[in-house]
Amino acid sequence: MYAVIRTGGKQYRVAEGDVVRIEKIAGDVGAEVTFTEILLVGGSESPKVGQPTVAGAKVVGKVLAQDKHRRVLHFRKEKEGWTRRRGHRQPYTEVKVTSIAG
């Protein structure tokens, strides 16, 4: 069984046992997380498509890590000889999907 969830303004296709990196959400490592914004639930039978979400469906996962992505660097060089270097590390949450109900 698989589902398409929406979290952090993005959509993810997940199945039971998958480990996904999503935009940072609140929760300690080891905590259980429930996603209720389910756009599609599929499996052996015909898929259930929500308009906009599937009623009564939910995906439960376990938080594995709260971390940051690799640094993204931005360089800027002007004609006069000065440079500027900026960096950014986007925080994320790593979640293991434990169950899909729908």
From Swiss-Prot:
Cross-referenced InterPro entries: bL21-like (IPR028909), bL21-like_sf (IPR036164), Ribosomal_bL21 (IPR001787)
Keyword RNA-binding among UniProt keywords: yes
GO cellular component: cytoplasm; ribonucleoprotein complex; ribosome
Superkingdom, taxonomy of origin: Bacteria
UniProt GO molecular function: rRNA binding; structural constituent of ribosome
GO terms classed as biological process: translation
Record keywords, A-Z: Ribonucleoprotein, Ribosomal protein, RNA-binding, rRNA-binding
Subunit comment: Part of the 50S ribosomal subunit. Contacts protein L20.
Role: This protein binds to 23S rRNA in the presence of protein L20.
Protein name listed in UniProt: Large ribosomal subunit protein bL21
